[in-house]
Amino acid sequence: MPNSLISRLVSPSLRSQPSKISALRFLTTVSAAERLYGQLQGCTSNLEKELASANVQLDSSCINEVLRRCDPNQFQSGLRFFIWAGTLSSHRHSAYMYTKACDILKIRAKPDLIKYVIESYRKEECFVNVKTMRIVLTLCNQANLADEALWVLRKFPEFNVCADTVAYNLVIRLFADKGDLNIADMLIKEMDCVGLYPDVITYTSMINGYCNAGKIDDAWRLAKEMSKHDCVLNSVTYSRILEGVCKSGDMERALELLAEMEKEDGGGLISPNAVTYTLVIQAFCEKRRVEEALLVLDRMGNRGCMPNRVTACVLIQGVLENDEDVKALSKLIDKLVKLGGVSLSECFSSATVSLIRMKRWEEAEKIFRLMLVRGVRPDGLACSHVFRELCLLERYLDCFLLYQEIEKKDVKSTIDSDIHAVLLLGLCQQGNSWEAAKLAKSMLDKKMRLKVSHVEKIIEALKKTGDEDLMSRFSID
């Protein structure tokens, strides 16, 4: 096969070169990082002043490069650099950068770094404000260091800094997620003593903690208290409590809570939405109580709330796992489509995928082919699952014929290059030369890129056939 063809098929990432612009940006980043890293190495006290004198433009790439250069014995300086960078008005750390800092500086494994830095601020009489301490607390949050976060919170007064609601929320969330709800509750009471009020984030953290601990009564009590501090009880909070109830297995109580949401319709604020109903439907389906799940779907429809794709997937899988017959599945799909929100294509595609995952291939293939006969376009996910299954069964010719039908329907497929390669290789191995050439031409038209290993195997398979016509077809642009 010509080298030019192999070059077109091989993934561009294996042969592309960085552009001049990318190289220039890289050099600029390295230059700034070198200057900042040099300040870190040469400074013995008040590092922040030295860093400010470098006068460089900071971005995430530069910060990452500086941290990456730090040796383990420089992690404390690296942490101070990261905190300083976050206090600048021209830069704000992303969640990704907090994660990177925790990973590079190994803060989870060496939590004492946090304490060393705070103590060094105090000894060197560095300027520390609320923003500085928030960044430290956010690092604790990212590293799941609840005890260290509480220690930092207690250090606020030493720098004449008053902790705000954001600072308390960061610590409360850590203890709530950890399951230490006594300390979290103590901190909420402490907020009241220092003139601060819990906000929606505070309550949400606590409610999540109570739900995770299975303390639904406490979660519900706290939700009712939200209004006392002008916090709106919304559908998100209700849904979280409802999810906790469903996980506990108390479905009767879940229905009671759902009824309360339906009754206390506050202009859409606490009215159940598709996510809320789907939580209850899924819980019933998991317990194989499909009839009750369908009753919840009826309630959903009666309130004018349309099911979404997730609702449809959950119900269809529930019906199939309950060994219901085809008539029951058809009835469900008709109801879902009539309610709106999901199409016939989405429902049939979901059924196909569910059946394949349940190892009920023959039924899945029948439904998939029925879709094509009825003129219903399957979605890309269903196509990918069907083609992959046919290739596993080595039914390459059947797979290719279906592939042709799908191409005619102009389906936006998620069929990846690996499936194309396996299908092409299988067609070659089984002597289906004409079909292989047609598939190869389609792949080239789509500018599809293959792994080197796949290209080599296909070339070898083509050689074994000895079909010169196929070789020439495969070489066509």
From Swiss-Prot:
It holds the Pfam family PPR_2. PPR repeats lie at residues 129-163, 164-198, 199-233, 234-264, 273-307, 308-343, 344-378, 379-413, 416-450. PROSITE patterns: PPR. Gene3D superfamilies: Tetratricopeptide repeat domain. The keyword Ligase does not apply. The keyword Iron does not apply. It comes from the Eukaryota. Keywords: Repeat. Belongs to the PPR family. P subfamily. This is Pentatricopeptide repeat-containing protein At5g47360. It comes from Arabidopsis thaliana.
